[in-house]
Amino acid sequence: MACCESWREALTSGGPVRFAWDPCVYEPSDDTWIAVEALERLGALGYRFESVLDLGSGTGVLAAVARTLFNPSLVAAVDLSPYAAKATRLTLGPDSLVTQCNGGRCLRGRWDLVILNPPYLPAEANEVKACEGLLDLAWSEEAGHEVLCRSAGDLGNQVVIVRSSLSTLDVDSCLSSMGFSKVATLSNRAFTLERIWTELWRRAA
């Protein structure tokens, strides 16, 4: 498996965060930075988390940002793609807990915070067949949005989820049916053809 990674940098309220990127991994875009804004807002509000899971990590930049902002005792990341798992491991360091698997099926226990920026585009909107079709999985909602949503509900006490007006998944029903309530909208941005926002959900006591 070839990996032609390069290094990028994201500026956050906690300082710069370096992350590895590979052409076969979803490149951080508007939805990523809106998720970063959400994490920054949680930090500004005084939230702290002892354990953080980045579910569908891609480059691992959101896990790295969470580590910078919250200084948790444990940060872990999961992605189906071997390219993404490798990039995330480079981003977080050789001793990091990074696993390649589908959703959270390889994990047990509960995490204080699960971060989820899921694939949400219709399958026909971005048919990328390069990289053994793995890049397409990072875009297309059909490939696993509901699987990831339910994994987040299984594993998290609180969930930060990125949402899009282009998505057809009923996220409210997905998380509500698993005992979660929406706490707040953390960031919200409108574009020409799309609105992207992030929400914080919390498991009922």
Across the structure, where does each feature detected by a protein language model lie?
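Residues at secondary-structure transition points
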Residues: 27-30, 79, 130, 142-146, ...
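SAM-dependent Rossmann-like transferase core, predominantly class I methyltransferases
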Residues: 2-69, 104-107, 184-186, 191-205
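Glycine-rich, phosphate-binding/catalytic loops in enzymes
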Residues: 69, 94, 130-134, 177-178
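Conserved Class I SAM-dependent methyltransferase catalytic core
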Residues: 21, 37, 143-201
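Conserved SAM/SAH cofactor-binding pocket of Class I
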Residues: 36-109, 113-127
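Mobile active-site "lid"/loop adjacent to the S-adenosyl-L-methionine
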Residues: 118-147
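Short alpha-helical
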Residues: 27, 61, 82-83, 146, ...
